[in-house]
Amino acid sequence: MPNRKASRNAYYFFVQEKIPELRRRGLPVARVADAIPYCSSDWALLREEEKEKYAEMAREWRAAQGKDPGPSEKQKPVFTPLRRPGMLVPKQNVSPPDMSALSLKGDQALLGGIFYFLNIFSHGELPPHCEQRFLPCEIGCVKYSLQEGIMADFHSFINPGEIPRGFRFHCQAASDSSHKIPISNFERGHNQATVLQNLYRFIHPNPGNWPPIYCKSDDRTRVNWCLKHMAKASEIRQDLQLLTVEDLVVGIYQQKFLKEPSKTWIRSLLDVAMWDYSSNTRCKWHEENDILFCALAVCKKIAYCISNSLATLFGIQLTEAHVPLQDYEASNSVTPKMVVLDAGRYQKLRVGSSGFSHFNSSNEEQRSNTPIGDYPSRAKISGQNSSVRGRGITRLLESISNSSSNIHKFSNCDTSLSPYMSQKDGYKSFSSLS
């Protein structure tokens, strides 16, 4: 069998360049073949002129190997896993949004700024070699500001079109494990062109510059691809500036506090479950069917998390438009019955109940002799004059310790114990037995 060395194309050199970054992220990539599955989405977002750099590297490698490309090889297009000829592919933008315009007017401009949070669900993700990577089935978007909270929302189900041959089971399994939207014959699904036009009217009702749109960084590849796919299907060409919510929060913190929070903290801020089942968060269909995954709910929970974290720092009073107040107040309240500071606190509560009234007078007398000093109001100070703490066995052990110097007198404890416990006029500590 001949020992032929595989040819290297532009995609090979792109993956080779990404390997150090993948290793820094902790991914198990030892060679190019291991890194290929992690690079297909990034490759699809490159523009044609950016891919030309790697194509030139491939030509130089072939020339060095003595493999000048023939006529058929020169005409062969560079393999693009996610790109269809003529489809608009955006340039990946991972830099934080420009907040300099807001800095000129201070906090008021930042509080009044309008942000749009967008998410698009799909019936799973098809393998990289497929021309159609996603099948959009649901879209959600909210209009939000720090001052007003959620001002408006947009939601629609999308007709995904024809399921690629051989992937029906794959798409059905992906749907059943998440949003549970039927993959076919769903009467609520709308034409992709109609949905995209309605989305454009929602985010850009008046002439002028288009506002930036934000989504989670983990969803950006899917949302970007679906927008361009729907734009091509409807022949509507409009470049939307799709940024990440994480970068938005970084920009707000830098503008307000001149500090940059860590991306790990921001992701933990956005990935919370306290509003998963809050009322008026999911769409009507997911709410009625008690399904957790909803594109509109993802957008609203982003707004809730930002309000919960940033609104109080700007001195904004939270309203129903910022967070679901009934769930917010419940999550911040504490049931008094579950709070037991210490045994003394627990016993103090029992003293006031029936059956312990004969302890009141002596307890008040002992508490009046307790030095306060600089200790907190609920702190207990050990010593001979401190208030009674803990259970009876604790007091007995303390009395034994205090009377260790007079141990010969403690032998009479059994005979003198009964008279002290039978007295009706109050309570005397065991330390008096000595």
Swiss-Prot record:
Localization in the cell: Cytoplasm; Nucleus
Tissue: Testis-specific. Expressed in various cancer cell lines, probably due to demethylation of its promoter.
Record feature DNA-binding region, as residue ranges: 4-73
Gene Ontology biological process: cell morphogenesis; ectopic germ cell programmed cell death; fertilization; homologous chromosome pairing at meiosis; intrinsic apoptotic signaling pathway in response to DNA damage; male meiotic nuclear division; negative regulation of apoptotic process; negative regulation of developmental process
Main location: cytoplasm
Keywords: Cytoplasm, Developmental protein, Differentiation, DNA-binding, Meiosis, Nucleus, RNA-mediated gene silencing, Spermatogenesis
Pfam families on file: HMG_box_2 (PF09011), Maelstrom (PF13017)
InterPro entries documented for this protein: HMG_box_dom, HMG_box_dom_sf, Maelstrom, Protein_maelstrom
Cytoplasm in keyword set: yes
Gene3D superfamilies, A to Z: High mobility group box domain
GO cellular component labels: autosome; chromatin; chromatoid body; cytoplasm; male germ cell nucleus; nucleus; P granule; perinuclear region of cytoplasm
Region annotation Disordered: where it falls in the sequence: 357-385
Gene Ontology terms, MF aspect: sequence-specific DNA binding
Keyword hit for Cell inner membrane: no
Function, as annotated: Plays a central role during spermatogenesis by repressing transposable elements and preventing their mobilization, which is essential for the germline integrity. Acts via the piRNA metabolic process, which mediates the repression of transposable elements during meiosis by forming complexes composed of piRNAs and Piwi proteins and governs the methylation and subsequent repression of transposons. Its association with piP-bodies suggests a participation in the secondary piRNAs metabolic process. Required for the localization of germ-cell factors to the meiotic nuage.
Protein family membership: Belongs to the maelstrom family.
Complex and partners: Interacts with SMARCB1, SIN3B and DDX4. Interacts with piRNA-associated proteins TDRD1, PIWIL1 and PIWIL2. Interacts with TEX19.
Name of this chain's protein: Protein maelstrom homolog
Gene: MAEL
